[in-house]
Amino acid sequence: MSIESEMIHVEVVYALPQEQRVLTLVVNQQATVEEIIRQSGVLEIYPEIDLGKNKVGVFSRLVKLDATVRDKDRIEIYRPLLADPKEIRRKRAEQAKESGAADPVTGGKPSPLRKAD
């Protein structure tokens, strides 16, 4: 097998609210996700990335740092959530009930068919 056939093309992606950085690399097909991320230089560009805390994935599927990838895969580094999505939805529903924008019984949109009490 030639050296060329052992190499694959991959992308390392890190997204911030104001920008998305896509780094394209040619790496050995046996390289792990962690090795590829380190080789990409993204950790130097964004020192806030901590591979011990930030989750990583390939095409939106979580993977471990010791996983290998295939040709043309996209390795994504995920930022931690700032708030719990369930908690945000609960608060939004409470506010809608209080303001009258939600049915006080069901919590959904008020039904025009329901009789007012």
UniProtKB/Swiss-Prot annotation:
InterPro entries: Mopterin_synth/thiamin_S_b (IPR016155), RnfH (IPR005346), RnfH_sf (IPR037021). Residues 90-117 are annotated as: Disordered. SUPFAM superfamilies: MoaD/ThiS (SSF54285). Belongs to the UPF0125 (RnfH) family. This is UPF0125 protein VV0820.
